[in-house]
Amino acid sequence: MSSSATLEIRGVSRRFGKNTAVSDINISIPQGQMVGVIGRSGAGKSTLLRMINRLVDPSQGSIFFDGAEVSRLRGSPLRRWQRDCAMIFQQFNLVPRLDVLTNVLLGKLNHRSTLSNLLGMFSRAECAEAVAALERLDIARTALQPAGTLSGGQQQRVAIARALMQQPKVILADEPIASLDPLNAKVVMDSLQDINLREGITVVTNLHTLDTARTYCNRIIGMAAGKVVFDGPPEELNREAVRLVYGADSSGAEISEAITSTSVAFKPKIAASAGPLEPAFPGY
């Protein structure tokens, strides 16, 4: 990989039957950017990421990384690309019955020989690398627990540790915080940002929330109806841009930016009445 490997999406579309999920997308992402892709449900965000990783093939157009076309890869070259382009999912995609350490070690499968994978044995160095990844995500204490016993936030951090084991050049995160509470969402986004800043790994993450995208991403891409309707730095995501991305509700009113917030809000306590309690149903 060159020192300035670029992910390029050229005229990419994806159709499912008569429905067009993604339409004529053209994006160039230099190495080291942290990109937030925002938009309403059904805007085409997940389909875009799945095409980049080649979980879904484009109906037309091409995808390049570091000058090589990845949209035509098959067999071993495709597996190498999916190793280099790690995917993090909303629903974690862990093996619940396996312990956390083994789930993280599975990120090494595409680095190993077929025989080693069939034997199911990992080296001491690989185990040490997996533990280090868990320590970095502050969940090493869960290493021997079944992954299915962890909270959602912990499971997502395990998924990030597994992605790190792939030694990726690109990380794609498909709605990584959609099922998490605000505090766990912050931990997950802090982790992705740390990886981006420390390793210089390109991170592209789908997000529903504007405040999260503005806080963590140095570039925001807005999608609506399968098309890119905004592409720029967070400071350019103004009211008009938000309207283009999120549109209006069924009554025609503009979508309020407040409803896309993940901020933790605390409701003020209501002082209890000092007077005697009255029965709700007198006579009972």
From Swiss-Prot:
Its EC number is 7.3.2.2. It comes from the Bacteria. Keywords: ATP-binding, Cell inner membrane, Cell membrane, Membrane, Nucleotide-binding, Phosphonate transport, Translocase, Transport. It catalyses: phosphonate(out) + ATP + H2O = phosphonate(in) + ADP + phosphate + H(+). It is a peripheral membrane protein. InterPro entries: AAA+_ATPase, ABC_transporter-like_ATP-bd, ABC_transporter-like_CS, ABC_transpr_PhnC, MetN_ABC_transporter-like, P-loop_NTPase. It is an enzyme of class 7 (translocase). It is found in: Cell inner membrane. GO terms for cellular component: plasma membrane. Residues 7-250 form the ABC transporter domain. Part of the ABC transporter complex PhnCDE involved in phosphonates import. Responsible for energy coupling to the transport system. PANTHER family: AMINO ACID IMPORT ATP-BINDING PROTEIN, PHOSPHONATES IMPORT ATP-BINDING PROTEIN PHNC. The complex is composed of two ATP-binding proteins (PhnC), two transmembrane proteins (PhnE) and a solute-binding protein (PhnD). This is Phosphonates import ATP-binding protein PhnC. It comes from Mesorhizobium japonicum (strain LMG 29417 / CECT 9101 / MAFF 303099) (Mesorhizobium loti (strain MAFF 303099)). The lineage of its organism: Bacteria, Pseudomonadati, Pseudomonadota, Alphaproteobacteria, Hyphomicrobiales.
